[in-house]
């Protein structure tokens, strides 16, 4: 069936369009007439349209990130429309600042993208919710008005400290141990120390000082007593114990310095002598090792010159002076007062000892650190306390001192101590973290039941000779260690790491020194005759001989017992322990003979000092 379809004029006719073929690229080859003379501007749907429709300039729904949806296309505003010809609609408006809601105000800063080049009075751009961004000059001027301008901007200048001892050219660096690596060490499950022998006499603590407060302060008295600061190899008891007990020997102060080295900022050094399979850790004679640091870990530690009242060395002397006097003032002293006596007398008191000796007891203990390492150390107690139940507790007494709260960026003790004692202690933990950690380690090593802190402040901020006691506070050593985040496992791990490194070395003399400006310690191999001055005192950088606890030009330094008297006293103290352990000695005959020869030929000097007032009080 054939049909014919007729096309009428009303039917749609398809006409093929003309297609342009661009051989050199893509897109049209010619610009249509409809789009000529029209400027091109990048466009984004999230862009603000300009001043005509910008009625949401101060409104902001997202307070946390006001410019979260800002786009890079908003950078081109040169084609925005501005009505400048018609002035008939000109009128004044209220330009008062709109009070914003306090929702997270000032907590977060907006996205600063696309803010470059938009200075004061700039047109368009993304508004940061009405927030004003200060320029660099404006911020600098504000800081100058507030008195917070520093040479180094927001950061304090680098602190250049001096080393505790000058490194000599003939010293060989054996090992460098940085603090981040040491802080990761751990030696768990170290048993408590076992007593070998105990010596000395203790006085009882006066509980009336627990009631001292800011309104009922007590002046700090000057107690004229002798404190013995004897190093390891000069201790006659340790010399005899080295023949039958242990293979590593030290004092509690030396051990605490090593265990808490990751918290220290100031430089210090310890001498180690390796004889056979034995290590002797010593402090150098006539150094400032026993002086207490002040604000060592503060953000801005004391950095005044040496002649200033608040120089680091003068503050250390003042803190040691306060600590010695406070630890003796809070005791019940007198001939009629009862005293707690240990099995053996003080091994450092000779027959020709002049003056009264401070209340102190020595506990010689040993620890098993595994792998054949047995540590023997001398620990100290400061006082004894009788509880209401009749139990006897041993105390470690220390003093915290306030010197100038404004300079030290601290808390005013006389205003906060009675009401906010926790804030005062927290500030001390921040400024003296290393010192408090070492005190805690010493109390734990000695097995003290309580550690008692005294808060001592200057009577006047510019007078370092007169002080007052504002209060006391006591803690259990283990609980206080947990509060200050002190891990004994890490402390034992650091000590064991250093012992292992030294045990691998050949026999000789070594020195561990904290780098004065870097968080690391170094082990040096030094000649055997280093620091041996043949009776002459080693001079410091200023040409003056160091004097431990030299509080003033008239500080009295008394000679200690002779070598024979000390050896006889020590022999009586450890006779029973040495006889019992003679058969169980683990050292070889050759090593024992070497140690015996080395300890017999050496002398046994002891350092005994009287506490007197600081130099400022005697001028």
UniProtKB/Swiss-Prot annotation:
Major place of residence: cytoplasm
Residues spanning the membrane: none
Region of interest (Disordered), residue spans: 99-160, 588-619
Region described as RNA gate: spans on this chain: 288-302
Pfam families cross-referenced by the UniProt entry: eIF-3_zeta
Basic residues: bias regions: 100-121
Gene Ontology biological process: cap-dependent translational initiation; formation of cytoplasmic translation initiation complex
Keyword list, A-Z: Cytoplasm, Initiation factor, Protein biosynthesis, RNA-binding
Superkingdom, natural source: Eukaryota
GO molecular function: mRNA cap binding; translation initiation factor activity
Family matches, as InterPro entries: eIF3d
GO cellular component terms attached to this protein's record: eukaryotic 43S preinitiation complex; eukaryotic 48S preinitiation complex; eukaryotic translation initiation factor 3 complex
Cellular compartment(s): Cytoplasm
Free-text function comment from the UniProt entry: mRNA cap-binding component of the eukaryotic translation initiation factor 3 (eIF-3) complex, which is involved in protein synthesis of a specialized repertoire of mRNAs and, together with other initiation factors, stimulates binding of mRNA and methionyl-tRNAi to the 40S ribosome. The eIF-3 complex specifically targets and initiates translation of a subset of mRNAs involved in cell proliferation. In the eIF-3 complex, eif3d specifically recognizes and binds the 7-methylguanosine cap of a subset of mRNAs.
HAMAP family according to UniProt: eIF3d (MF_03003)
Quaternary organization: Component of the eukaryotic translation initiation factor 3 (eIF-3) complex.
Entry comment, domain topic: The RNA gate region regulates mRNA cap recognition to prevent promiscuous mRNA-binding before assembly of eif3d into the full eukaryotic translation initiation factor 3 (eIF-3) complex.
Family per similarity comment: Belongs to the eIF-3 subunit D family.
Protein name: Eukaryotic translation initiation factor 3 subunit D
